[in-house]
Regions:
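Positively charged, polyanion-binding regions of nucleic-acid-associated proteins
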Residues: 1-20, 51
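Alpha-helix N-cap/helix-initiation sites
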Residues: 1-2, 17-22, 39-43, 60
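A short, conserved structural fragment
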Residues: 54-62
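Short, cationic-aromatic polyanion-contact patches
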Residues: 64-70
Length: 70
């Protein structure tokens, strides 16, 4: 288990291409990076993490809802 920030980064590194935030969320859950019993608002956590990563310049939004590593 990891923080939402770490989970989003791990999924994007593994993907190696821009992917939609819902796919990021799904892959993070399937890989066990996020636990819905520990973080009940998984959707909110993923979206907050993406906003923070974009603000920090680590992730870019390529189109509506689609993100990639910077």
């Amino acid at each position: 288990m990891s923080s939402a920030l770490e989970a989003v980064l791990a999924v994007l590194v593994d993907a190696g291409e821009p992917i939609h935030w819902t796919v990021i969320q799904d892959r993070a859950l399937r890989a066990g990076y996020l636990d819905p019993f520990v973080e009940p608002d998984v959707r909110g956590a993923v979206l907050r993490a993406l906003r923070a990563l974009v603000a920090d310049g680590l992730v870019v939004r390529t189109e509506t809802g689609v993100y990639a590593l910077a």
